[in-house]
């Protein structure tokens, strides 16, 4: 995407090699600051401290972290150490594990003296793939928005705009470029469709108010920042035509783990018959997990993120301000799980599907579990279970 007219990705290699540059997202929207990451430790810190965030971008950054680790120590022990260091940074986003496993697999058979160069090339390929996947998500999501426009009569001069609510930041700042949930919105805006975006502030880190609003404003997309608890009211009064969010991990059965508060938006959308879509690339699907509520680890972050807010004062200084009484404890769950039954559809790079095992298997047949022979003991047990459920 463009930053002040300059095409910009969220992560890019230094011209002379041996380092990568990132956008320090903790400084937005008040300052646009880039930071150079020179080694594995710097990459791990950037992920842990959320200088970079969003599942796809975390994965891409981790890939470069492995590459920088190979420049430091290309031995088998060095590869293991780099992967373990990065895996420990944040537990919920599955793209982190996916990218690290992809790097480790591609480097395992490479001689140590060639690993640094091979790792650098592989990390770049992962970033390029992310951009292509996200643009494809945008194309498929655009089709849904066009259908909404026809239903609402917007294309024929009917009452507009198309009001879309989003939660947290699943734009280009959460990926290498384009974004997931926001990619269809950018495509729709650029196609001339009259859209308006309701932007949840997304406490406690205010990633909607700080990051999504900054993105949309930079691109010229009409939007309004709202308090997190406003969405249900807007839906009750017919002011939301569609909800679209991203995801940090999606199960093989269509459950979605996303920023805390997503589940409440899905409940409100379900109660008011508002379509609720989730946008995601294939690497965000965790094919090893079936029950999101029971199996996905939920990151708990520092309570200070809840008890303090960061912003610009009237004097122009950027400061942290405490908003809770001294001594009041705070809980800071970073994510929640939205059950598949509340989701209208999943928008992927391969198309749109139902949030279900069958829906995902239809788009990713190579990842679908092998069928159990009907005559086997497992098959008979499964059949008995299915019959009992009836």
Curated annotation (Swiss-Prot):
One of its GO terms (biological process) is L-methionine salvage from methylthioadenosine. The record marks 168 as: Transition state stabilizer. This is Methylthioribose-1-phosphate isomerase. It comes from Rhodospirillum rubrum (strain ATCC 11170 / ATH 1.1.1 / DSM 467 / LMG 4362 / NCIMB 8255 / S1). The active site is at 248 (proton donor). Pathway: Amino-acid biosynthesis; L-methionine biosynthesis via salvage pathway; L-methionine from S-methyl-5-thio-alpha-D-ribose 1-phosphate: step 1/6. Substrate binds at residues 53-55, 90, 207, 258-259. It catalyses: 5-(methylsulfanyl)-alpha-D-ribose 1-phosphate = 5-(methylsulfanyl)-D-ribulose 1-phosphate; 5-deoxy-alpha-D-ribose 1-phosphate = 5-deoxy-D-ribulose 1-phosphate. Catalyzes the interconversion of methylthioribose-1-phosphate (MTR-1-P) into methylthioribulose-1-phosphate (MTRu-1-P). Also catalyzes the interconversion of 5-deoxyribose 1-phosphate and 5-deoxyribulose 1-phosphate. Part of a bifunctional DHAP-shunt salvage pathway for SAM by-products. It holds the Pfam family IF-2B. Disruption phenotype: Mutant cannot release methanethiol upon 5'-methylthioadenosine (MTA) feeding. Deletion mutant accumulates both S-methyl-5'-thioadenosine and 5'-deoxyadenosine extracellularly.
């Amino acid at each position: 995407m463009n930053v002040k007219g300059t095409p910009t990705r969220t992560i890019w290699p230094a011209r002379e090699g041996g380092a990568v540059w990132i956008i320090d997202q903790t400084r937005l929207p008040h300052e646009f600051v880039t930071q150079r990451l020179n080694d594995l430790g710097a990459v791990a810190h950037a992920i842990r401290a959320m200088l970079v965030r969003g599942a796809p971008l975390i994965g891409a950054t981790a890939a470069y972290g492995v590459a920088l680790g190979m420049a430091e120590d290309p031995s088998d022990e060095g590869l293991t150490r780099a992967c373990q260091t990065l895996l420990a940074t944040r537990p919920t986003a599955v793209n982190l594990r996916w990218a690290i496993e992809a790097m480790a697999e591609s480097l395992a058979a490479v001689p140590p003296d060639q690993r640094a160069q091979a790792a650098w090339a592989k990390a770049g390929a992962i970033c390029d793939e992310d951009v292509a996947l996200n643009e494809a998500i945008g194309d498929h999501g655009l089709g849904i928005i066009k259908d909404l426009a026809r239903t609402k009569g917007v294309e024929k001069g009917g009452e507009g705009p198309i009001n879309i609510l989003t939660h947290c930041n699943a734009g280009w700042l959460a990926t290498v470029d384009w974004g997931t949930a926001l990619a269809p919105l950018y495509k729709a805006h650029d196609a001339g469709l009259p859209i308006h975006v309701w932007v949840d502030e997304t406490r406690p880190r205010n990633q909607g108010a700080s990051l999504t609003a900054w993105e949309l404003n930079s691109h010229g997309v009409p939007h309004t920042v709202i308090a997190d608890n406003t969405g249900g009211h807007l839906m009750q009064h017919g002011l939301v035509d569609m909800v679209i969010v991203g995801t940090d991990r999606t199960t093989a059965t269509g459950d979605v783990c996303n920023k805390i508060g997503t589940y409440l938006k899905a409940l409100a959308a379900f109660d008011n018959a508002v379509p609720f879509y989730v946008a995601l690339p294939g690497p965000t699907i965790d094919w090893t997990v079936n029950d999101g509520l029971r199996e996905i680890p939920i990151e708990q972050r520092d309570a200070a993120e809840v008890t303090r807010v960061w912003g610009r004062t009237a004097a122009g200084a950027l400061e942290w301000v405490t908003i809770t009484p001294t001594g009041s404890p705070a809980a800071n769950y970073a994510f929640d799980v939205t059950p598949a039954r509340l989701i209208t559809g999943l928008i992927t790079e391969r198309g749109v599907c139902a949030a279900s095992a069958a829906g995902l298997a239809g788009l990713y047949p190579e990842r679908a579990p092998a069928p159990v022979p009907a005559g086997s003991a497992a098959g008979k047990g499964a059949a008995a279970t299915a019959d009992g459920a009836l």
